[in-house]
Amino acid sequence: MILALALGGMLSAQAQHVQESNFCSPFDFPILLSANFGELRPNHFHNGLDIKTQGVTGKPIHCIADGHVSRVAVLHGGYGQVIYVTHPNGLTSVYGHVISFAKNIQACVRQYQYAHETFVCDLKFQPGQFPVKKGDIIALSGNEGASAGPHLHLELRRTETGEYIDPMPY
């Protein structure tokens, strides 16, 4: 009970900051969740929202705010394919389990994979390389990595510290 009250107080303070940031939805259909922020998992707390994608892969994912693609990774487990967008308000949004990235980003990933003869990669980008605007399609939803069904794993983090923030309040 005390832990719940303490977590509730922390999330409330964070919610006020997030509401000021003017984010949009990552999808153009009504949001239904399969998992919430802070849910207890076998060995950790869930650090984001799992958004259902109507039981299918390939749904366009919209960038929730202006910023730049700062990182993409392709992994066998975990997020599978993941894209990180750094925003000027000091937050980074993370989109996990995607099936593919926007064409310009996907081309960069493929070029790296072929040049280095590896599927797995973790690429970091400079602010001017891949700028994005709120609403731009940055990826397609998937079921990649450690995923039990099609969905988008969406996280918000403080860019400087990596601290997780509940995306729900926006």
Indicate where each model-derived feature is located.
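A short hydrophobic beta-strand segment most commonly corresponding to one strand
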Residues: 152-161
